[in-house]
A protein has these predicted regions:
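Glycine-rich phosphate/adenosyl-contacting loop at the front of the ribokinase-like
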Residues: 1-55
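Glycine-rich phosphate/dinucleotide-binding loop and adjoining beta-alpha-beta core of small-molecule
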Residues: 56-104
Length: 104
């Protein structure tokens, strides 16, 4: 019997929420899982969207986004951070090898 504990890389996505599952944190979490990573998220916007298009965006207050990020990092941590399309400028201004940004 194998009793070796499996460890996973931890990845945090900071992005909007897409209810259709094709973009945003939903797509990121599926990708992390497919790559063998434990995925966590901080939601920056709730989006009214489907496969046809976006009909509305409701931004999450900055202080709440910061709170989500702190909660994840204080408890679970992150080996890498992926920043969604609308937040790419933040990543570009703070170049690190463990931060990835969606250029869209």
């Amino acid at each position: 019997m194998n009793t070796e504990k499996k460890t996973y890389k931890r990845a945090l996505t900071i992005a909007g929420s897409d209810p259709s599952g094709g973009a945003g944190i939903q797509a990121d979490l599926k990708t992390f899982s497919a790559c063998g990573c434990f995925g966590t998220s901080a939601i920056v916007a709730v989006v009214d969207e489907n496969t046809v298009g976006v009909t509305g965006v409701h931004p999450v207050p900055v202080e709440f986004v910061v709170g989500q990020i702190r909660s994840v990092l204080d408890d679970i941590g992150a080996d890498a951070v992926k920043i969604g399309g609308g937040m790419g400028n933040i990543a570009r201004s703070n170049r690190r090898s463990d931060i990835y940004y969606d250029p869209s």
